[in-house]
Amino acid sequence: MRAKLSPVSIVAEIAAALMLAAVPAAAESTWDQIKRTGQLRYGAVDYPPNWYRDKTTGKWTGFAVEMVEDVAKEMGVEAVPVETTWATCVLDLQSNKTDLQFGLQATPKRALVIDFAGPAYNLYWYAVNHKGFKASTWEDYNKPEVKVAAMLGSADVVILLKVAPKATRVELNDVASTALAVTSGRADAMVTAVLGALVAKNRNPDLGDFVLPTPVVYLPSYIGLRREDNNTLQKFLQAWAEWNNLLGYTEARIKKYLDSAGATNVPENVRF
């Protein structure tokens, strides 16, 4: 015989059921999402030798592509490129458009909204001058009459604001545009990491001096990822970055794609 429930008991049961229904389901972690979909989505920026796309096939190549493909292989999933820019790649991570982004400097502003693993490698910051323009220190560029091109939304702009805040900045969407600004005389110089600077100099013989301004700027480059409570992906990427650096795989990949881009004039003091 079923016992009768008192009105108080009925109310209590209903309240408990409502409370359970109100508890949101736990958000799926990025790691679990990648495993479920079988896809690791990565941001691909038009910035050789990190990433560059074959105009005929549409296929992305570059050392950062090879790195992501190795990460995907270790995870047992497929690497899927998602075209982005330096100005939008952090937003793409936040909005779940991509799962990771190679080639990011961990600036304080970025660290407020995303997490990082690494460093994956380290980079010097170079300037490539217009022919006829001479400069060798950051102070030489730190003048209002000196126009310096840099990529919009990139760490190049952040660094330029620190080392040459008085320079007149010419902010453009990609490295090809910054190089064109210098060769055309719209800018006196361009500033970017050594990899992009080497490729730009090789592809544009009309560019002038390739300069490592002093004091030297040498910064680590990280893998950016979405901020979340579950840090499984972050821990995995941290281990992956350390392992590949210790065994020399990272430097070998970078030099391989510099060579394929024809940028063989790497200064002896440059290490990645």
Please state what every model-predicted region is.
Residues A27-L104, L112, Y257:
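Extracytoplasmic small-molecule ligand-binding "clamshell" domains
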Residues V65, V80-L91, A135, V170-L180, ...:
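Short helix-initiation/N-cap motifs at beta->coil->alpha
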Residues T88, L104-V113, I159-K162, D188-V217:
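A ligand-binding cleft/hinge motif common to bilobed small-molecule-binding domains
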Residues W51-T56, V68-E78, W138-N142, D156-N173, ...:
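Ligand-binding cleft/hinge of the Venus flytrap
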